[in-house]
């Protein structure tokens, strides 16, 4: 499998963690998804975390909060042992994302990575 075929892009908020009232210091992991990320990492996957966090509070100017957002997410990942290779900020803030390769978090958590094949 080539490198792209073993790369996943994963949203952060309400995908790998839950947060109440934007209290990111007290975010809680979505255990089933984090467990699947650990499994994926141990099987050689590259994990890119891509988030729209900060886009609202910066009015779409992510450079104003980029360092803060990356530090919030890196701290969470360290605290809860969430594997990742890179944190990418600046995902457009939207009500809906339409993507032919998308999975809902519960679908991902139940996915058999050994018998899954990508749509490239």
Region spans (language model):
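HAD-like aspartate-dependent phosphatase fold
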Residues: 1-120
């Amino acid at each position: 499998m080539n490198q792209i075929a073993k790369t996943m892009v994963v949203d952060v908020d309400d995908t790998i963690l839950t947060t109440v009232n934007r209290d990111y210091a007290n975010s809680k992991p979505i255990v089933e998804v984090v467990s699947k990320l650990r499994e994926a990492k141990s099987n050689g996957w590259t994990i890119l975390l891509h988030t729209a966090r900060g886009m609202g509070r910066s009015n779409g100017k992510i450079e104003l909060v980029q360092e803060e957002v990356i530090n919030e997410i890196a701290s969470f990942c360290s605290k809860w042992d969430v594997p990742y290779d890179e944190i990418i900020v600046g995902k457009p803030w939207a009500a809906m994302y339409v993507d032919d390769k998308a999975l809902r978090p519960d679908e991902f958590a139940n996915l058999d990575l050994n018998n899954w094949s990508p749509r490239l």
